[in-house]
UniProtKB/Swiss-Prot annotation:
It comes from Homo sapiens (Human). NCBIfam families: glyc_debranch. One of its GO terms (cellular component) is extracellular region. One of its GO terms (biological process) is response to nutrient. CDD domains: AmyAc_Glg_debranch_2. Its EC number is 2.4.1.25, 3.2.1.33. Signal peptide: none annotated. The gene is AGL. This is Glycogen debranching enzyme.
Amino acid sequence: MGHSKQIRILLLNEMEKLEKTLFRLEQGYELQFRLGPTLQGKAVTVYTNYPFPGETFNREKFRSLDWENPTEREDDSDKYCKLNLQQSGSFQYYFLQGNEKSGGGYIVVDPILRVGADNHVLPLDCVTLQTFLAKCLGPFDEWESRLRVAKESGYNMIHFTPLQTLGLSRSCYSLANQLELNPDFSRPNRKYTWNDVGQLVEKLKKEWNVICITDVVYNHTAANSKWIQEHPECAYNLVNSPHLKPAWVLDRALWRFSCDVAEGKYKEKGIPALIENDHHMNSIRKIIWEDIFPKLKLWEFFQVDVNKAVEQFRRLLTQENRRVTKSDPNQHLTIIQDPEYRRFGCTVDMNIALTTFIPHDKGPAAIEECCNWFHKRMEELNSEKHRLINYHQEQAVNCLLGNVFYERLAGHGPKLGPVTRKHPLVTRYFTFPFEEIDFSMEESMIHLPNKACFLMAHNGWVMGDDPLRNFAEPGSEVYLRRELICWGDSVKLRYGNKPEDCPYLWAHMKKYTEITATYFQGVRLDNCHSTPLHVAEYMLDAARNLQPNLYVVAELFTGSEDLDNVFVTRLGISSLIREAMSAYNSHEEGRLVYRYGGEPVGSFVQPCLRPLMPAIAHALFMDITHDNECPIVHRSAYDALPSTTIVSMACCASGSTRGYDELVPHQISVVSEERFYTKWNPEALPSNTGEVNFQSGIIAARCAISKLHQELGAKGFIQVYVDQVDEDIVAVTRHSPSIHQSVVAVSRTAFRNPKTSFYSKEVPQMCIPGKIEEVVLEARTIERNTKPYRKDENSINGTPDITVEIREHIQLNESKIVKQAGVATKGPNEYIQEIEFENLSPGSVIIFRVSLDPHAQVAVGILRNHLTQFSPHFKSGSLAVDNADPILKIPFASLASRLTLAELNQILYRCESEEKEDGGGCYDIPNWSALKYAGLQGLMSVLAEIRPKNDLGHPFCNNLRSGDWMIDYVSNRLISRSGTIAEVGKWLQAMFFYLKQIPRYLIPCYFDAILIGAYTTLLDTAWKQMSSFVQNGSTFVKHLSLGSVQLCGVGKFPSLPILSPALMDVPYRLNEITKEKEQCCVSLAAGLPHFSSGIFRCWGRDTFIALRGILLITGRYVEARNIILAFAGTLRHGLIPNLLGEGIYARYNCRDAVWWWLQCIQDYCKMVPNGLDILKCPVSRMYPTDDSAPLPAGTLDQPLFEVIQEAMQKHMQGIQFRERNAGPQIDRNMKDEGFNITAGVDEETGFVYGGNRFNCGTWMDKMGESDRARNRGIPATPRDGSAVEIVGLSKSAVRWLLELSKKNIFPYHEVTVKRHGKAIKVSYDEWNRKIQDNFEKLFHVSEDPSDLNEKHPNLVHKRGIYKDSYGASSPWCDYQLRPNFTIAMVVAPELFTTEKAWKALEIAEKKLLGPLGMKTLDPDDMVYCGIYDNALDNDNYNLAKGFNYHQGPEWLWPIGYFLRAKLYFSRLMGPETTAKTIVLVKNVLSRHYVHLERSPWKGLPELTNENAQYCPFSCETQAWSIATILETLYDL
C-alpha cells in the first residue's frame, strides 16, 4: 500500500495483438511489462520505440528492454522490464518469443500543458476551448479585441481554423498556400507574418493563461493552389491514377448534362432548371439511363477487343514450333485489366488460352473450331464486365439522385435553387483547367500525359466507408459509383507510402507542420479519419520534435470504438472531440456526461501499483462544434445555458464555438461567412451589433461555468453522478474523494421552445445529501425589452432580446430559484437537504456546493488520518485529533507484529465448519452467497473482484450501505477471542466507530481502505515469520506460503493427540470451560471445506505428503516437529493411522502413511538446523502394544528413533490384523474381507507389499458405493501388491537409516524378525541392496518385447514406462500407466537409470500431464473417465457414485512430483534438456499461479476434471496440492 509512485503493469500474453486497445498513461508513471501465464519460462524480449532519456524519438528505432528479477532466483515469475514515462506521444511495443513476433500494441502518453508567467500546469480535464473561424477575426491588429471575448468568457484555450491563405471557395479548410499567412489579415500599409502570430500566441499564454491551437489539413489543397499546378504528381490525376479515367469520362458527361439543364435544353423532356418534385427526379434517372450511359459505353474501358484477341490466338495456334509455357491448371481465363484504361485495351493470358482450348489436330477446321470456342469465351467475359459496370452505374444513379434530393428538395438541405454553372446538378469530381471543347476531343485528353496530369480528383468523404482504406487508390470504385460526397474546391493529395514516393508533397507538408508547431501548442487534425495514418504519424513526429508536449485533438467519424482506437493509439491523439449536439434529448446528454469521464461517486481507492486497463479516449466535449447546425434552430435559444452547464460538468475537457454564447441564431458557415466577430466592450449596449460584454447572450453565465469547470478539474473532483430528475431536468454531481465536497448542477433543459411548447409548472423536489454551503451560481434565461434580432451586415451578431440573469456565491436563503430547503436525516448519520423549487423555468440552472455535515466531515478526516499509515493517498483531507480511542495510537503494524501464525489463521481464514466449532459461521450476504472464510480473506476475495471494476452495485456493497451488520461482524468476531486477536478486533472496532458516522454511500470505499490496509499488514507479518525462501521469494511463492497459515490452525477442540509432557516448548492455553491448562498444537487440515474440522480434519497420509511444503519449506519447524511426534504416538501394528480421529478413533487401514511419515522425519532432519535432535525427542505412546487401550500422555515415553525402528521391524516381520469395530459402524461400504489388513516385505526383492482386492490402502482409495451399479464394497483401485510409490518411499527410508546407522546416529543396523521360530537379522544394507537390485528389473516395462523379466508380456500396452505396482491380485493393474512412479523418482532417484527414467517421464508428459494436475490414469485405458461426479448414481459400474475418482480426473499433488522428477533427471541429461525443462516447469506452474490468484479460497484444489474443468466435489484448497507446488518452486 505504501507506494506513492504510479505504476501500471501490462501483462504480455502469447499472440495477443492489442493494436486496437487504447492504453493511456501520464508522464511520471512507470510502466512495467510482465509475462502472462502463456509466456512464463519462455525466452521473451520486449522491444519499444520509446526513446532513451535525452534521445529524440524515432518511430522506426526500436530497442530491447532489460528484464529485472526482484527475487534473483530461477523462479522469475515476478520479473519485469519497465519504462519511466517522461515524454508525450504514441509509442509502440512488441515482443518476440525466441525470434518470432508474438504480440504488441501501443501506449499513449498524455502531454503536459503549461500556461501563465509562472508556467503552471493546465490539466487536460480543465481545458475550456473556444473555436474561432480565423477569417472572421478581421485584420490582425483587431484580433486581440475580438479574442478578448474568449478570455472574458472564461475560456483557457482558443482553437483557430487554419490561418493560411484560403482558396477560391473561401472555405476555412481549403488552403491555397499551406506556408503563407492569410494576406487578408494584413493592412495595405502593414504586412503581418508568422512571427507576429507567434508573439500574440505567446502573449495570450503568458498574460491571459490561454493556450492556442490550430488545425492542420493534410488531405487536400485548394484546387487553385499554385504549387499543385507546378507539382501535379501530388494529386490523384489521370497519369498517376489511370484507374480514374472511366470515372472522369462519366463526370464530364454529367457536367455537360448539368450545363444543358441549366440552359433549359431538357425542359421538354421534363427537367427544368429548377428541380422541384419526384417527377423531375424520375426524368433525370430516365435521361441518364437512356441517353448518357449508352453513349458513354463505360464498359469498354474494362473489356477486350474480341476480334483482335481471336486473331492473336489464331496466329499462336498456327505458329510452327511454338512453346507453351506451362500454366497452373487451377487458373482460369480471366480479363487482365489494361493498366492505362484504354477502351478495349484489356487482354487475356494467352498461355492459359492455349492450354484451355486445344485443337484435336493441326488441320484448319480444328483450328477454326478452337478459335470459335475462344471467341465465345471472350464474348462471355466481356458480358461479365458489362454486367459489372451496369451494377456500378445503378449505384452511381442512386447516389447522384440522393445528392440532388439533398441539395434541392430536402427540408434540412441547402435548397440551392435552379441548376446553374455555379450550382451544377451535381458537384464535379475532377478539375478541368482547360477551355471546353467537343466531348470526344475532351476524352482524347485522358491519354495525353501533358494534359491528363492536370485532370485531378477532388477530395470529399464516403459515408460508411472503411477509414483505413484510401478511396482514391486502385481497387476502389468510389469515383465511378459516385459515392463521394465531394468538396469541389479541394484536390485530394496523393502521398504514396513513403516520402520517396512524392518528395515535394512530403517536404511541403512537413514544412507546413513545422511552422504550425513552432507557434502553436496544439493541433486539431482536420478530417482525421480520412488522413492516411502513416502520413499523420510522420507529420506529428515532426511537430512533436519541435513541441514535445503537443496537444493533439481530432474528430473521428469511424462509427466504431475499435477503429477510433487505431487512430488514437497510432497518432497519440490527446483528446477526441465529442459533440453534445448528437444528443436527441436531455437524458442522452446526461448519459454522454457520464460516458466521457470520471468515476462513480464513492468509488474504491485503487492501489498505486495496478494492472494497466484499456481506456476510452480522453474527451473534448463540445456543446457545439463549427460543423454543427445551429442549436437555436435545432432546439431553442433557451437551451444554450442548461446544455452548456451539463457539458461543463463532465469530468473531461470541454469546449464551444464562437457565436454560441452570443446566441447567434444561424450556423456560422465555414465557407460563406465573411463578416467579422464582435469585439469586447464592457460599456456596450445590447443594441450595439458590433460589440459584446457580460450583458450579451449567456456570456456572464459562461464565465462562471468555465471557472467552475476549471476548479473542479484542478481540485480533483473526479467522481461523477448523473441524475435524470425528470424528462427535462438533469442534475450532475462532481465529487472530490479526498475532501468529500460535491458540486451539484441542476439544469432544466429547453430542447423545445418554451414559448411554443408545454412545460410543467410542477418541478419535482430534490434531495441533496449533505450540507449546502452555498449556491455557486443560479442563472435563468430571460427575455429583455430590446429590438429583435436583425442580421448585421458587418458583424456576426447574436440575439439581443434574450440574455441571462445570474447571481453567484449566494446563500441558499437568498436564492430566487429555490422556494425552501428543509433538513432531513436518513439514518443516524446521513443529512439530506430537501429542495423545493419555484423558479426553475426552462433554460435555468442552479449549482450548489455541498459538504458532508460537520460531524461526518470530522469522522472522515480522522479515518483518513489513521489510514495514512497504509498509504500516503489519504494525507489530503486527514484530521488528527487527541481524543481518539487509545488503541488507534498504536500503529497497526506494531499490533500485528505480536501475532503468531496460528493467530493469523484465525484472523485471516477459517471456513464455515471450522468457525462452527466455535459457535460462529461465515458471513452470509443476502441475495448473493456466504463468504468463503470468516476471517479477512473472505472479505478481501470479494473486494479484490469488485474493487478494480468499481462495482458499487454489487450485493456486497449494498449490504454495507444498508446497515452495520458486516462491519460489526468483522470486529466482534475477533474481540470475542483472547489476547492479541482481540486487540486487533478492538483496533478495527475503533476505526469502524468513525466509519459508521460517514454517509452510507462512502462506507464501501472506506471499509475497503481499512481492511486492505490491515490485511496487507497482516500478510507482511505472516511472511516475516517464515523462512528466508519465502521472505525473499516471488509473489507466487509468498501467496502459496499463505496456504500454511490457511490450513494450519488450532480449533476449539485439539485435533492432535497430546504430546509428551517431557517435550519442551509445546504451546499451551487455558481451556475456556475447565479453565485448566491444555496443549494447543497446530494441526494441518487436509483440505477446505470438506476436511477442516472434527475427526475429519487430520489424515496421516495427507499430513505427511503436505508437511514438507506447508511447514518445513516455510520454516515452521516447531509445528512440523509436534505433528511428527503426535502421529508417532499413535503408531500401532507398525502403521501410522490415515484418519487420525485424535488417536482414539484412528483407523489403521492405509499402507502408505507410515512411509510418508518416515520421509517427513528424514526431510526434517535434513532441512531443520540441528534437525537430527528430533530422533531423541520423547514420544508419548498411546498404544505401546498393538492391543493396548489408549494410554494418557506421559504414561509411556519413547525416543522417536525407537518408534521408527518398531515400524521397520513390524513391516519386515509382516503385519496382519483385523480392523477394530470392523463393520458398517466404521465403514458402511466395505465388504467384510476389506477389514483384514496385511502388509510385509518380500524376502526376495525387499519390496514392501500388502492389501487385498477388497481394500484400498494407498492414496487411490475410492471404495465403491453404488448398489445400482453393483460396485458397493469393491475398491476402484485396490493397488494391492507392491505399489510403486511405497517401494520408492521405503527405499528412501531404508537408505537413510543405513546412512545414519553407519554414522551411529541411529542405533540400529538391522531389523530382527522371527521366521519359522528362529530370529533372523536383516541388515539395512541388505534390504537396501535388494530393492536396488530388483526395482528396475521388475518395475520397468522394457522396450524389448522379448524381455525375460516380463511375467505377463500379453498385458503390456505401453512400453518404456514404469509399472504402477508389482504383484497385484489383478495382474493387468500392474501395467496401468499412472503418475505414481514419479514419486519414487523424487524420493529414491537412485532406483532409476537416467535414460529410462527420462523416456517414462516423456510418456507421462504426453499422456498424463493436464493444465493443473496429472491424469490419474492413462486416457488410452478402457476404464479411463476424466470427469468425477460423486452424485451420479446410474448403472455404469465404472462411474456410479464417483467410482472413477482415481481413474482419470486430474489430481494436483502428483504434478509436483512429476515436475520435480523432470527437473532432477533433466540435470543429468545435460544443460540443453535442463533449459527446456525449466521452461516447461515455469509454464505449467504459471497456470497454478493464475488459479491461485483467481480463487476466492486463495488455494489450489484437490483435483479438477479433465483438462482442468472445475470439479464441484473437490476441496477448493488442499494442503498437499499447495505443498507439492511449493516444493517444485523450492527445487527450481
